[in-house]
């Protein structure tokens, strides 16, 4: 399956799951291509812009909110993890991979800032879409650099595929280079789950930490 087919499928799934403007659905999907060395540094959007359209709180809302999909994988300590164990705490769920050169580290840094600014308990959950390289020890080393108490999850190929499908996340490995190195094209959104386990927001790449804080405050009742 080509990258275009994957991107089309991801856009269709996202559009079916969340009421957001089509331009934001496309921006979320197309910006993920920057994780690939063959992808563009910038993506052209309707109107000729080279950056994603501004994101507002209204653009991100699941209407209505719905129970977050199941997420049962292995954490960076090699222990079984169930998203349900975080009930009572807000969570920001992001699918990415440790070899991502740009979008993933940018997103995680922004989520770290947002979580610290929010000032109330919130867990950032990083789910790999590259389990072949992202073992539990590899994820631990990667997330430890952020010094933010992130939860990192991995699993078998089948387990990751099941989780990604449940969350409407698309991903695909790019062709490897002569040294066996490869990049991944993937959905680049962050998912906000409230303390009752409800999926509240689909936050496109490029949303500011201030917006994320605002969404957290709304989801927590202030």
What are these regions (language model features)?
Residues 66, 90, 115-118, 143-146, ...:
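Sec/Tat-exported extracytoplasmic proteins
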Residues 71-91:
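A short beta-strand-turn-helix
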Residues 159-215:
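Thiol/disulfide oxidoreductase modules built on the thioredoxin-like
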Residues 1-70, 74, 222:
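N-terminal targeting signals for export/organelle localization
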Residues 68-69, 91, 187-189:
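Short loop/turn microsegments at loop-to-beta-strand junctions
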Residues 84-111:
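Short active-site neighborhood of thiol/selenol oxidoreductases, capturing the structured segment around
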Residues 106-163:
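Structural microenvironment flanking redox-active thiols in thiol-disulfide oxidoreductases
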């Amino acid at each position: 399956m080509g990258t275009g087919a994957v991107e089309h499928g991801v856009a269709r799934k996202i559009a079916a799951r969340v009421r957001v403007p089509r331009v934001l659905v496309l921006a979320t999907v197309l910006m993920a291509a920057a994780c690939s060395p063959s992808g563009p540094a910038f993506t052209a959007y309707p109107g000729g812009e080279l950056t994603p359209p501004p994101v507002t709180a209204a653009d991100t809302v699941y209407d209505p909110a719905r129970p977050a999909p199941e997420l049962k994988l292995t954490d960076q300590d090699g222990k079984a993890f169930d998203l349900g164990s975080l009930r009572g705490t807000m969570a920001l769920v992001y699918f990415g991979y440790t070899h991502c050169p740009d979008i993933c580290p940018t997103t995680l840094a922004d989520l770290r800032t947002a979580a610290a600014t929010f000032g109330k308990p919130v867990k950032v959950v990083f789910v790999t879409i590259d389990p072949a390289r992202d073992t539990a020890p590899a994820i631990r080393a990667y997330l430890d650099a952020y010094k933010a108490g992130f939860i990192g999850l991995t699993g078998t190929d089948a387990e990751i595929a099941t989780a990604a499908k449940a969350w409407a996340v698309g991903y695909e490995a790019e062709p490897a280079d002569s040294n066996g190195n490869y990049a991944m094209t993937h959905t680049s959104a962050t998912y906000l789950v409230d303390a009752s386990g409800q999926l509240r927001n689909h936050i496109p790449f490029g949303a500011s930490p201030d917006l994320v804080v605002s969404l957290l405050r709304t989801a927590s009742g202030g």
